[in-house]
Curated annotation (Swiss-Prot):
Keywords: ATP-binding, DNA replication, Nucleotide-binding. Gene3D superfamilies: 1.10.8.60, P-loop containing nucleotide triphosphate hydrolases, Winged helix-like DNA-binding domain superfamily/Winged helix DNA-binding domain. GO terms for molecular function: ATP binding; ATP hydrolysis activity. This is ORC1-type DNA replication protein 10. Involved in regulation of DNA replication. Disruption phenotype: Essential for normal growth. It comes from Halobacterium salinarum (strain ATCC 700922 / JCM 11081 / NRC-1) (Halobacterium halobium). It comes from the Archaea. GO terms for biological process: DNA replication.
Length: 413
């Protein structure tokens, strides 16, 4: 009978792996001096005792929006303690799973109420929920900053974003001074807002651009001093992680995830140090995970649509127009077992758009004058990652094998 394996600590690569994690808050935010200065200027009315600005912060995922917000609000809450005439409360709400002003208002009410006194998520008129929210805010009093992270999730159902900043002027609040900080990954969200909401919510706008490779390398260097053990990092590793992340999204989170996973791979192999080979292996694994995560959301026809783009890529024929991808898709439908007739081209176009939103495809708009505009698509993940993620899902082994052979001959692999 085999004995049960035991757990043993591995500490040859990492000194403090948590320093590479998403929840880690560094003492100093790197490479965001200009944004911090503008943000502090927008928050200055709080320390001065005036009504707070409403602030709209936007930029891609992983560019420091939430980290800078958390850092500055923590500092602000500490600094206001030096003044007797200012009290500050910060309410943080992630709106990712909320799709309307009503749902946001309910969540805010329940955050402000004591346990056991929460209200139901359904069954109230919207204005009734807003009234309850005003009552809770007024009871709290002082200056209140409401941080709505991923605020774009509520879409165009944005009544609260109009009502709340105006609550004091409309007589719904007397003692409480409320400011909203909206954080969004969607640059176009502001354009979708009601013009009245734009006027109130976007008093101060702060844009966080993607990091470049040098900035990402500096961020990684500051973390590796804490996270990685001495002599456990080969030369050029942080620069390689930074270059890959800068080329893709400019995301510090992506660069940190690459380094963390590369370290885990090195540790599992009992390597003395993290190498660029470990980084490349980590990149491939993260890409595969991204595709697989997106794949879980796809129907069979969504997967066949993706495989059609893979087929075009194998022929070195991408970016490809929707029509050409549709023809490839229809051919694959005939080969696939237990598959209904091909969908209409419009439905395949919708699947292509979904794949673009999931980060699996790149989408290009082509303007061709009198012939009208059209879209073309290509893979936004490595060919191997897309194939590997589908190999065990679609029963098209022979077709996939042909694609891999063709890709190899065309230099795609």
């Amino acid at each position: 009978m085999l004995s049960m394996p035991s757990f043993e600590r591995k500490q040859n690569i990492f000194a403090n792996k948590d320093a590479l994690g998403e929840s880690y808050q560094p003492n100093k935010i790197e490479e965001r001096d200009d944004e911090i200065e503008k943000y502090m200027d927008a928050l200055q009315p709080v320390i001065d005792g005036w009504e707070p600005n409403n602030i709209f912060v936007y930029g891609n995922t992983g560019v420091g929006k939430t980290a800078v917000t958390d850092h500055l609000l923590d500092q602000l809450q500490t600094d206001v303690e030096a003044y007797d005439d200012v009290t500050l409360s910060v309410i943080y709400l992630n709106c990712k799973t909320l799709s309307s002003s009503y749902q946001v208002a309910v969540e805010l009410v329940n955050k402000l109420r004591r346990p056991g006194a929460e209200i139901s998520s359904t069954g109230y008129p919207q204005q009734s929920v807003f009234k309850k929210l005003y009552q809770e805010l007024e009871a709290l009093g002082g200056t209140i900053l409401i941080v709505l992270d991923e605020v774009d999730a509520i879409g165009d159902r944005d009544d609260l974003l109009y009502e709340l900043p105006r609550a004091r002027s409309q007589g719904n609040l007397e003692d409480a001074k409320v400011g909203i900080i909206g954080i969004s990954n969607d640059y176009k969200f502001q354009e979708q807002l009601d013009p009245r909401v734009q006027d109130t919510l976007c008093e101060r706008e702060l844009q966080f651009p993607p990091y470049d490779a040098l900035e990402l390398a500096n961020i990684l260097d500051s973390r590796t001093d804490i996270a990685i053990a001495d002599d456990s990092l080969a030369e050029g590793v942080t620069q390689h992680c930074a270059a890959l992340a800068a080329r893709d999204s400019g995301s510090a989170r992506q660069a940190l995830d690459l380094l963390r996973l590369a370290g885990e791979l090195a540790e599992n192999q009992d390597a003395d140090a993290i190498s660029t080979d470990h980084v490349e292996a980590a990149r491939s694994e993260l890409e595969r995970e991204r595709v697989e995560e997106g794949m879980r959301e796809l129907t069979t026809h969504g997967r066949l649509t993706l495989l059609a783009v893979v087929s075009k890529a194998a022929k070195a024929d991408t970016p490809s127009r929707t029509r050409a991808i549709y023809d490839e898709y229809a051919s694959l439908c005939k080969s696939a077992a237990n598959t209904d007739d091909p969908l209409k081209q419009r439905s395949v176009h919708n699947h292509l758009s979904d794949l673009h939103m999931l980060g699996i495809l790149s989408k290009y708009e082509n303007r061709s004058g009198s012939r009208g505009n059209y879209y073309s698509y290509e893979l936004d993940v490595p060919f191997e990652s897309a194939v590997d993620a589908m190999a065990d899902v679609l029963m098209l082994d022979a077709e996939i094998e042909k694609m891999e052979g063709l890709a190899s001959r065309n230099g795609v692999l």
